[in-house]
């Protein structure tokens, strides 16, 4: 029986916490996917790497997915029109089927996603004070958490199944109000 080829996934992140979380996923799911070491940077970085870096360019035809892990409202993503063009270009690097591009976006801050690993919450995350409150709530659940800390990020990531359930719950609430 032929061995199944694992999907190849490249990940681009904006912050240290996202990088640590992705490293956890890479180790946790190494039996089902080849997740490359995450790179700090988003759309322009990915575009440049797949155009100029031989490691990326030469693997484009065997790349299954490209993930972008970022906060939506921090202003670092730039123009959505420009992003859409880059995503379209990246998808077409592989002929058939195209590369699947996933936008793993958090609203406000990644700590909101991390908090969903513990409980169902729908906090306001508009101001700096509200983001600091999310951080405090997360630290109540995972004492010692600071952005980019590998140990606490891994403790949080261990609860990824609960985060998925709680995230679906949050999305269900937002659909009710449409």
Question: What is the role of each PLM region?
Answer:
Residues 1-8, 19-36, 51-65, 72-176:
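C-terminal accessory helical subdomains adjacent to catalytic cores in phosphodiester-
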Residues 13-15:
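Helix N-cap/beta->alpha junction signal
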Residues 42-48:
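Eukaryotic endosomal/vacuolar membrane-trafficking regulators centered on PX-domain-mediated PI3P pathways
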């Amino acid at each position: 029986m032929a061995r199944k080829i694992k999907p190849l996934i490249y990940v681009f992140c904006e912050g240290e916490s996202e990088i640590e979380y992705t490293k956890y996923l890479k180790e946790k799911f190494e039996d089902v996917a080849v997740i490359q070491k995450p790179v700090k940077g988003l759309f322009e970085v990915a575009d440049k790497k797949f155009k100029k870096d031989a490691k990326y360019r030469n693997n484009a035809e065997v790349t299954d997915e490209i993930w972008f892990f970022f906060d939506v409202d921090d202003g670092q993503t730039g123009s959505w029109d420009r992003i859409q063009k880059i995503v379209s270009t990246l998808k077409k690097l592989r002929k058939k089927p195209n590369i699947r591009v996933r936008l793993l976006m958090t609203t406000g801050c990644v700590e909101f996603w991390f908090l969903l690993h513990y409980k169902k919450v729908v906090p306001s995350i508009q101001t700096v004070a509200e983001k600091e409150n999310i951080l405090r709530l997360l630290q109540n659940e995972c004492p010692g958490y600071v952005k980019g800390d590998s140990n606490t990020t891994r403790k949080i990531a261990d609860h990824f199944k609960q985060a998925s359930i709680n995230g679906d719950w949050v999305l269900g609430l937002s659909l009710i109000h449409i």
